[in-house]
Amino acid sequence: MKISRLPDRLDRMPMLKILVFFAAGIALADRYELPLWFLAGAFVVTGVLALSLRSSAATAAMILTAGFAAAQFRAPRATVPRGVHTVYEVTVEGFPADRGRYAVADASVAAWRDPADGRWHASDARIRLYADSLAGLHAGERIRCRGAVRPFRGGAESYRRLMARRGYAGTLWIAERTLLERLPGRHAGLHRRAVERLSRLPMSAGAAAVVEAMAAGERRGVTPELRTAYSRSGLSHLLAVSGLHTGIVFALVNLALWWLPLFRRGHLLKNLLAAVAVWLFVAAAGFPPSAVRAAAMCTVLQAALASASEYVGLNALAAAGFGMLVWNPSWLGDISFQLSFVAVAAILAWGVPLCRRCRTRWKGVNVVVDAYLIGFVATVATAPLVSHTFGVVPLAGLAVNPLAIALAGVVVFGGALWMLAPVG
């Protein structure tokens, strides 16, 4: 693309410009703090200037102020005391991972008791729950225990900031003697039922860990050795449900429903069923942020296909990203959000045009070339982020990504069919 055509292309992608200034406001709020009354006044003043003077600079300032205010207003706040030994009511989320002498699971704190006056206080904080082998943890159960929520220790400072952005207040260790009561558990959600269905398949422990991680986003069986092996080969992105997995389901569902447009209004039914299938897959995976972003973009694309309107991929991606940042501004600092967004943007901006330029007369060759080019572009685009965050650039992924994506398509789509099938 020529530089001279960049302003014209940006004019056709208004959501991309909005996203840039909104994200800049969120980034500034991470470093500075301003009174909300000041931000409200600045938003009104810049909005009036933008309307009266039709000033693009005032519009940009208004959007930046909105991002700053949203980040400051929606900043994660701990609703549990840290370092205070008291009683907590905790719900275990997902499936606990067995680490030998202890088990670990994500959990949410429903309430905690004030040790000073004995009063209970509601909470919505998330914690990383550790329990020794005698206590035992079960997916979805509610427990009442005694302990203290403590800040994350060890690891890099970036990891602690990441957990804070994701709403984690800290860690809580429990033992058999500090486990006071097991309460009636909540009903199994779609994610738990999906993982339970996958666990019925006759597979080895290693294969089950990979299938559960790729199809349902459940990483309980992923051992440190398996994670390291995938990371060194440049395939660690396959072990967490992300935009790649959602895109595989989107593409294969549309391919499987190719025959519906042969009937009257069949194209509308096809688009509706494809969108529903994508969101069901994301729900079965537990709504990971990168998959939600991809599902939102796929829905925009599906709606564009249904209405036969012009689809601009980057604009749709920007709209999905803007909506997610409005919902949760802290996702801007989430490395999984950053990687998936950069990868998809690079594929749309460079990968798709590159695939068109390398088109041949042989369809089989085109499929292989397209898979390699898409993997190459995504790997190169995300290499700076990966290098900065993890200190390694997995160049091996450039060679093995095409085959890995093809195999991932079989695992993800087959797993999705098994999880969501109404029988079995």
Model segments located where?
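Membrane-interface helix/helix-cap signal primarily in integral membrane proteins
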Residues: 2-9, 60-237
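Juxtamembrane/interfacial segments around transmembrane helices
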Residues: 51, 62-68, 82-88, 103-112, ...
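Membrane-interfacial loop-to-helix junctions in multi-pass transporters
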Residues: 203-207, 265-273, 407
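N-terminal leader/targeting segments
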Residues: 1-82, 157, 293
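Alpha-helical transmembrane segments of polytopic membrane proteins
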Residues: 37-44, 339-340, 401-406
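Membrane-interface amphipathic/re-entrant loop segments adjacent to transmembrane helices
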Residues: 172, 181-188, 192, 232, ...
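Hydrophobic alpha-helical transmembrane segments in multi-pass membrane proteins
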Residues: 17, 25, 29, 37, ...
